């Protein structure tokens, strides 16, 4: 019987699959559907220091091999989460990851301080948010901007700090090196790709903001390439995500060197995707005589 446990940040996780932010609520919503204890963790719906109403207009559009979303970080805010969502999230029997974004360095720092004090397991910093002090350019585009925000956050973060990277970064290897140098304990990538769709009848973009984030199997080969680059650039753990639908998909990321994986869009297709993929990984390992994930992690790199 394969041992699916993963050692990450000095702790042992039950499995290599973590539910990705924005696709799994805060966790309790799925507690009656699947056994969450077999997961490596749950990264809850993305938060900002203060709540946001999200975007107007269309928010979701299915593509031939993916999903476009323009949610706009709708969320109740950090304090509401701490008081109303976190207690139930802690009962799910798996590692509590909290995804946080902010429009200024100060917002990020204050949010991290509050969340760490509330008792979470991992802080996942989303640096795809626009930096209002840099003309709206996301923190995750230029390495120097990412290094600045991660450095400030790492000084106050008392739990493992995972930085979630944007695929729009100018250079994935340089970005990874910058956030590692700034104090990140791990990296997750990649976030959604910017995409566009046109409504032919209205003769205008489907989404009010013109562009939306593309996820799903269409991006998987590109995400895998970026994970490969990240693993080769840094010495901290890399969590791979982007279009994982099956155990075989997840194993590709692990063989590329990922310490663990996150599953996102697949949860919309199959509410049991995370536990199913975990089981499929174990089945493949048993069929191939692989006892632990360490035996195959990074094996494709030679």
Question: Where do the language-model regions lie?
Answer:
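N-terminal capping/small domains of soluble enzymes
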Residues: 1-96, 102
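Active-site metal-binding loops of divalent metal-dependent hydrolases
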Residues: 22-23, 242-244
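Alpha/beta enzyme core
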Residues: 32, 103-239, 245-258, 263
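Short gly/pro/ser/thr-enriched loop/turn and capping motifs at secondary-structure boundaries
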Residues: 48-53, 130-132, 194-197, 268-270
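C-terminal helical cap(s) of enzyme catalytic domains, especially alpha/beta-barrels
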Residues: 54-64, 198-212, 254, 266-291
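Small/polar glycine-rich anion-binding or flexible loop at a beta-alpha turn
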Residues: 244-248, 270, 302
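A short, charged, Gly/Pro-tolerant segment at domain boundaries
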Residues: 294-302
């Amino acid at each position: 019987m394969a041992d699916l446990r993963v050692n990450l940040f000095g702790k042992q996780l039950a499995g290599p699959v973590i539910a990705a932010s924005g696709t799994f609520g805060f966790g309790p919503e799925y507690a009656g559907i699947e056994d969450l204890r077999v997961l490596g963790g749950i990264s809850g719906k993305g938060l900002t220091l203060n709540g946001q109403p999200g975007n107007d207009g269309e928010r979701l559009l299915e593509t031939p091999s993916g999903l476009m979303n323009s949610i706009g970080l709708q969320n109740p805010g950090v304090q509401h989460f701490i008081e109303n969502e976190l207690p139930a999230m802690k009962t799910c029997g798996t590692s509590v990851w909290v995804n946080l974004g902010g429009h200024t360095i100060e917002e990020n720092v204050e949010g991290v301080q509050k969340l760490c004090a509330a008792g979470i397991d991992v802080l996942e910093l989303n640096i795809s948010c626009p930096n209002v002090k840099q003309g709206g350019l996301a923190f995750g585009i230029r390495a120097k901007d990412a290094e600045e925000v991660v450095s400030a956050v790492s000084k106050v973060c008392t739990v493992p700090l995972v930085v979630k990277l944007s695929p729009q970064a100018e250079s994935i290897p340089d970005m990874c090196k910058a956030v590692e140098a700034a104090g990140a304990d791990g990296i997750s990538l990649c976030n959604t790709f910017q995409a566009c769709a046109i409504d032919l009848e209205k003769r205008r973009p489907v989404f009010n903001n013109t562009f939306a984030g593309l996820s799903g199997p269409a991006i998987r080969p590109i995400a895998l390439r970026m994970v490969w680059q990240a693993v080769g650039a840094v010495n901290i753990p890399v969590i791979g995500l982007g279009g994982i639908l099956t155990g075989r998909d997840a194993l590709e990321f692990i063989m590329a060197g990922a310490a663990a994986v996150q599953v996102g869009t697949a949860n919309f297709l199959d509410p049991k995707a995370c536990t199913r993929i975990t089981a499929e990984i174990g089945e493949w390992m048993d069929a191939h005589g692989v006892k632990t994930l360490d035996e195959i992690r990074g094996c494709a790199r030679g």
